[in-house]
């Protein structure tokens, strides 16, 4: 075969594979086969000097550009007017209704009833791609002023989900948002000398980096949502436009909703607000746009905004505030960790006063100092984290000092990797109290009525220094505790006695092995079936267990090497604790060996009971949807997991369909 022809075929084939992998999330070729064809193409291009502009080899280069050139957009990239309340959306909607009624009353050709299309408002950097009459990507540009942007074509080509060639013979400009996913952000920060402050800065900084190789390291993604300019037949509706974007192979978010009433819009706002922190990327609101293009054209624009669309903005999930102090706290493992004390700031609808700082390495890497203005980010409803400092605020600030002794008990501290630990395991109150509380917890020994307040009193007044001491408690001594009468004392003793008969997985979890949670404990018990077998397990045997990696395996081995650990376990057993394992008979079913995700509310099952049912059928129950997911069981109010399953082509079952299958 002619070598040029072979190059053209390889380019077409590799671009098809890239679309399947990066846009559809479902590759039809192995990484090994892809790499083989890719390097075959590299060699052929080198040999012949023949390179197509849309070849995948043209995505990343070592070029460092001298400057950014200007690019004049064919069609303006408008900003959107913003609303933060439903009342503001109502006012906008009423203006649209009034316009429609007046127009239809005076015009021979009526406009259709109002229909709105809702899409997510991505928090990244707006980009405009232009494709020539051959469908080849010729320019990628930033929004800039809306009329003129910066040419970032080389940077845009590093985004692997962006097609370098499309099946379209009209000159085209398409608008989208370059974003950085949480996964890409965390991976980059784990390896970077200077960590990124947030996802948006990560995307914007990458596209505006003259060193294209640096842009590529950030592994950006993109979503497209608008055709700004197109020669040829115009679109009649926004939905028609979105369908065009999808059929041309551009990556799109799968959340697109049609609404005709304010109640429907409110419902969608509430839904997206609920799931926004579960997403793998940042959004800061919803875009609400009129579907009919002719209605849009007649409504027109203000000086700044189109009248036919509005952005509903959520509360900020990132803010700047002042770092007042750093508090050092001791965890169950003895790790001493810093917590930032902040000047109160409103963030994502709550007042934030504290934030995570992780460790001294994290503090140094981010350049955090007392008295500085810091960037604070809140996501997934967890304690906010400090992402970095405002450089201009560093004058007059103080260095954060690492503690020399334990802040709780005054004992000597030791370094292990990037963390510091208090070695006073038995005498350090926070360690012991948290250890006892963990041991007594519902997922562990399930000692009913046990609280942190009780644990504190047992430590302070009854000299409890080990979990085995719980089984030596005496009725008379419990009566000396605050708010402990005869009934409460007896109830606690009864609950402790009852806890002796426990499952092996609960007992294993109760021991507090570092990095071993409830699920891992269950997986370990399934594999080894007894405490004795687990204690003797080799590294190779441990990592063969599903989801047990090197770190977890080493944690388990080190835990059972400790003389004190074995002493505590033996004492618990001698005091009558009886961890038992009953091998469950796994029924033959279509779910045998399959990965299943459950989302939404089921009528006949709680989360625990559906999990137990699936496991009895031989399924692995996962908390997140991926290409490896086999089934998603969707109940009422199914959320983002349902949407992701749909986009990946994962089989979705209703509760009724699930029950019919079993």
Swiss-Prot record:
Question: A single Gene Ontology molecular function, please?
Answer: metal ion binding
- Residues the record marks as active site: 121 (n6-amp-lysine intermediate)
Reaction(s) this enzyme catalyzes, per UniProt: NAD(+) + (deoxyribonucleotide)n-3'-hydroxyl + 5'-phospho-(deoxyribonucleotide)m = (deoxyribonucleotide)n+m + AMP + beta-nicotinamide D-nucleotide
One GO cellular component term of this record is: cytosol
Q: Which SMART domains match?
A: BRCT, HhH1, LIGANc
Q: What is its EC number?
A: 6.5.1.2
Output this protein's name: DNA ligase
Q: Which organism is it from?
A: Clostridium perfringens (strain ATCC 13124 / DSM 756 / JCM 1290 / NCIMB 6125 / NCTC 8237 / Type A)
- Gene of origin? ligA
């Amino acid at each position: 075969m002619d070598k040029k022809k072979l190059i053209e075929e390889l380019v077409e084939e590799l671009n098809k594979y890239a679309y399947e992998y990066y846009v559809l999330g479902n590759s039809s070729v192995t990484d090994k086969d892809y790499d083989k064809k890719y390097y075959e193409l590299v060699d052929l291009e080198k040999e012949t000097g023949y390179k197509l502009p849309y070849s995948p080899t043209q995505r990343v280069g070592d070029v460092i550009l001298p400057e950014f050139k200007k690019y004049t957009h064919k069609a303006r990239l408008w900003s959107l007017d913003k609303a933060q309340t439903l009342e503001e959306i109502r006012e906008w909607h009423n203006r649209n209704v009034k316009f429609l009624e007046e127009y239809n009353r005076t015009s021979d050709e009526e406009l259709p009833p109002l229909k709105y299309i809702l899409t997510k408002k991505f928090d990244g950097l707006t980009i405009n791609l232009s494709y020539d009459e051959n469908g080849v990507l010729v320019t990628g540009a930033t929004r800039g002023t809306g009329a003129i942007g910066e040419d970032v074509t080389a940077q845009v080509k590093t985004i692997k989900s962006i097609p370098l060639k499309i099946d379209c013979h009209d000159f085209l400009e398409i608008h989208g948002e370059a974003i950085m996913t949480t996964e890409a952000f965390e991976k980059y920060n784990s390896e970077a000398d200077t960590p990124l402050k947030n996802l948006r800065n990560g995307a914007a900084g990458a596209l505006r980096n003259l060193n294209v190789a640096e842009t590529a390291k950030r592994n950006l993604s993109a979503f497209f949502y608008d055709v700004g300019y197109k020669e040829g037949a115009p679109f009649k509706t926004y939905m028609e436009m979105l369908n065009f974007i999808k059929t041309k192979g551009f990556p799109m978010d799968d959340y697109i909703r049609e609404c005709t009433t304010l109640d429907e819009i409110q419902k969608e706002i509430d839904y997206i607000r609920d799931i926004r922190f579960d997403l793998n990327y940042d959004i800061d609101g919803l875009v609400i746009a009129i579907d009919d293009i002719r209605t849009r054209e007649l409504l027109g624009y203000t000086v700044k905004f189109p009248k036919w669309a509005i952005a509903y903005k959520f509360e900020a999930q990132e803010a700047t505030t002042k770092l007042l102090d750093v508090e050092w706290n001791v965890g169950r493992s003895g790790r001493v960790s810093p917590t930032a004390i902040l000047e109160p700031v409103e963030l994502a609808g709550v007042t934030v006063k504290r934030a995570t700082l992780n460790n001294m390495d994290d503090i140094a890497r981010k350049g955090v100092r007392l008295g500085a203005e810091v960037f604070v980010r809140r996501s997934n409803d967890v304690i906010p984290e400090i992402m970095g400092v405002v450089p201009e605020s560093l004058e007059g600030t103080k260095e954060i000092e690492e503690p020399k002794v334990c802040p709780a008990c005054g004992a000597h501290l030791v370094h292990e990797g990037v963390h510091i630990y208090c070695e006073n395991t038995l005498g350090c109150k926070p360690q012991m109290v948290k250890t006892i509380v963990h041991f007594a917890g519902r997922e562990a020994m399930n000692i009913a009525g046990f609280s942190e307040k009780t644990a504190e009193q047992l430590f302070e007044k009854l000299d409890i220094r080990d979990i085995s001491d719980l089984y030596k408690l005496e009725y008379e001594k419990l009566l000396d505790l605050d708010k402990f009468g005869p009934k409460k004392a007896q109830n606690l003793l009864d609950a402790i006695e009852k806890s002796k008969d426990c499952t092996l997985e609960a007992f294993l979890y109760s021991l507090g092995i570092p990095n071993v949670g409830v699920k891992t404990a269950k997986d370990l018990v399934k594999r080894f079936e007894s405490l004795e077998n687990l204690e003797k397990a080799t590294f190779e045997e441990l990592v063969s267990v599903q989801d047990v990696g090197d770190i977890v395996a080493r944690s388990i081995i080190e835990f059972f090497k400790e003389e004190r650990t074995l002493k505590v376990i033996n004492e618990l057993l001698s005091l009558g604790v009886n961890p038992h394992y009953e091998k469950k008979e796994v029924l033959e079913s279509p779910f045998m060996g399959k990965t299943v995700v459950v989302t939404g509310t089921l009528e006949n099952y709680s989360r625990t009971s559906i999990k137990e049912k699936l496991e009895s059928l031989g399924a692995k129950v996962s908390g997140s949807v991926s290409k490896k997911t086999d089934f998603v069981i969707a109940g009422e109010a199914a959320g983002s997991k349902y949407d992701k399953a749909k986009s990946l082509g994962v089989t979705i079952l209703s509760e009724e369909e699930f029950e019919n299958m079993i």
